[in-house]
Amino acid sequence: MKVVLLSFTLIIMGTLFSNAQTSKSATQSLSSVKVEAYYFHMSTRCVTCKAVEAEAKKNLESLYGEKVKFQAINLEDDANKAIVEKLKISGQTLLLVKGDTKINLTNEGFMYAVNNPEKFKSIIREKVDGLLKL
């Protein structure tokens, strides 16, 4: 009888320990999700459009390295149709994404990338830092 009770207790303990490990690894996986930055653009671009991409990419790489993945995506390229539809993009857009959270920095990019790049950098830092804390 003691052997049966001991065996039963060990099985229950093993199951609980296994579930705790699974839960812990799932939590770690979620917290390691990176922030993604997308700059959606047309084929023909003005000086400001190019500056938004260049400044955003430079700032994200210098501030965050591999913690933030930057991609420039041509809206007119059919190969990009899936990501454009997934993120519901309809025009030139600078977008930060982490999971279901999206932050649109298009207006800030066009206001500051050329005339006040330091202000643009501080806005990027503020928004990305907020996403990394999620």
Write out the residue ranges for each language-model feature.
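Local sequence-structure signature of Cys/Sec-based thiol-disulfide redox active-site neighborhoods
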Residues: 29-62
